[in-house]
């Protein structure tokens, strides 16, 4: 594979995460405007965004098999057509049913693109370099999550209709579409060139189960925590601005942490540093929940920094449990993480209704403790050392 081809594929991976980050995180910015557009209360409008999450979940789950049937380049190009149709549907329709369908299609497109992006990184890079590259790729999710809400605020402040925000997000997919030209993708399944030697099917091992549970608990814990921090802070008497600043501080340090750890991870055994980071994150979250108001910004900043590498490290370790990175295995762990996203309000909503925001934060803290236990247990069964040692960079 030529170096220019590798660079193009890597940029497709970066932009695939930016696309999903933009679609998921911009929701909160435009929800009120969309509710006004359809003359609905915000509470009932928020339910329609479940179609976006459902699309992401279904596409990541199905793409484990789809990758072996439909070439990756064909998927990305067809995805561009679907993206154009979905954005056009948002622009020219006043029907709530069509809006929900367009959101579902956007979810499908971003889920397929993100799973392809993750798979490309696991194919292009080996050993410890894979972990650092995947972490840098994941930082594009957070970066888009910072940039596109600002774009949305800029457009909405000038009374420009909300659907132009999605047209701007579509430009990210346009860049992916352009990059597919003159670019060779790894072939899979029936499209792959088969060698004379029979392909040995590898068993995943119990380590994959530990990592899948860790992925689900981590995402559910993280989103359950950060979703209720503003309510918890307001309950302590903090202003709305100060409560919002806590969330901004978390994501800002999360992004800086991703950049820092994309360099740091190369020098450590991934399972060991993951266990340390999961333990530190659980302790820092507990200190945030039980600490004084004066110390809360510091605890959430350090929590964001030290927890930033956890999810990507889980995916990387998963890809290293087999000798050859398996798209089905990587997508299985991604699917478990996405299920965590879907369950966020299903799990935390009733807890908050019954016992208040602090109970939701303590539940999230308990989930982080489960992540630590899973990562610690993985140390006894992980195969990553025997699979990554020859290729460590």
From Swiss-Prot:
GO terms for molecular function: transmembrane transporter activity. The chain crosses the membrane at residues 11-31, 51-71, 78-98, 101-121, 134-154, 162-182, 206-226, 245-265, 273-293, 298-318, 332-352, 361-381. Residues 32-50, 99-100, 155-161, 227-244, 294-297, 353-360 are periplasmic. It is found in: Cell inner membrane. Residues 1-10, 72-77, 122-133, 183-205, 266-272, 319-331, 382-393 are cytoplasmic. Keywords: Cell inner membrane, Cell membrane, Membrane, Transmembrane, Transmembrane helix. PANTHER family: L-FUCOSE-PROTON SYMPORTER (PTHR43702), PROTEIN TSGA (PTHR43702:SF3). Belongs to the major facilitator superfamily. TsgA family. HAMAP family: MFS_TsgA (MF_01044). This is Protein TsgA. The lineage of its organism: Bacteria, Pseudomonadati, Pseudomonadota, Gammaproteobacteria, Enterobacterales.
């Amino acid at each position: 594979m030529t170096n220019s081809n590798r660079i193009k594929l890597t940029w497709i991976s970066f932009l695939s995460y930016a696309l999903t980050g933009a679609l998921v995180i911009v929701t909160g910015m435009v929800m009120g405007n969309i509710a006004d557009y359809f003359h609905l209360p915000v509470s009932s409008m928020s339910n329609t965004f479940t179609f976006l999450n459902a699309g992401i979940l279904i596409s990541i789950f199905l793409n484990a098999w789809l990758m072996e049937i439909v070439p990756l380049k064909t998927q990305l190009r067809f995805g561009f057509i679907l993206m154009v149709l979905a954005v056009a549907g948002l622009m020219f329709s006043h029907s709530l049913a069509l809006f929900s369908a367009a959101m579902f299609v956007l979810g499908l497109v971003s889920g397929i693109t993100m799973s392809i992006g993750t798979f490309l990184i696991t194919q292009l890079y080996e050993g410890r370099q894979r972990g650092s590259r995947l972490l840098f790729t994941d930082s594009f999710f957070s970066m888009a999550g910072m940039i596109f809400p600002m774009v949305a605020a800029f457009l909405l402040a000038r009374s420009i209709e909300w659907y132009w925000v999605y047209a701007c997000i579509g430009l990210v997919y346009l860049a992916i579409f352009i990059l597919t030209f003159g670019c060779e993708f790894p072939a899979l399944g029936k499209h792959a060139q088969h060698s004379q030697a029979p392909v040995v099917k590898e068993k995943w091992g119990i380590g994959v189960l530990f990592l899948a549970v860790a992925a689900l608990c981590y995402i559910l814990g993280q989103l359950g925590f950060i979703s209720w921090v503003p309510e918890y802070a307001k309950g302590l008497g903090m202003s709305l601005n100060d409560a919002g600043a806590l969330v901004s501080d978390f994501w800002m340090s999360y992004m800086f942490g991703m950049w820092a750890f994309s360099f740091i991870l190369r020098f450590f055994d991934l399972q060991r540093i993951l266990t340390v980071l999961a333990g530190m994150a659980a302790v820092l979250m507990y200190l945030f929940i039980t600490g004084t108001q004066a110390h809360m910004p510091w605890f959430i900043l350090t929590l964001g920094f030290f927890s930033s590498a956890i999810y990507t490290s889980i995916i990387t370790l998963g890809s290293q449990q087999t000798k050859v990175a398996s798209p089905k295995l990587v997508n299985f762990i991604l699917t478990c993480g996405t299920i965590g996203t879907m369950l966020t309000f299903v799990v935390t909503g009733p807890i908050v209704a019954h016992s208040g925001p602090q109970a939701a934060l303590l539940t999230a803290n308990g989930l982080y403790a489960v992540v630590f236990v899973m990562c610690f247990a993985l140390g006894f069964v992980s195969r990553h050392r025997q699979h990554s040692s020859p290729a460590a960079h």
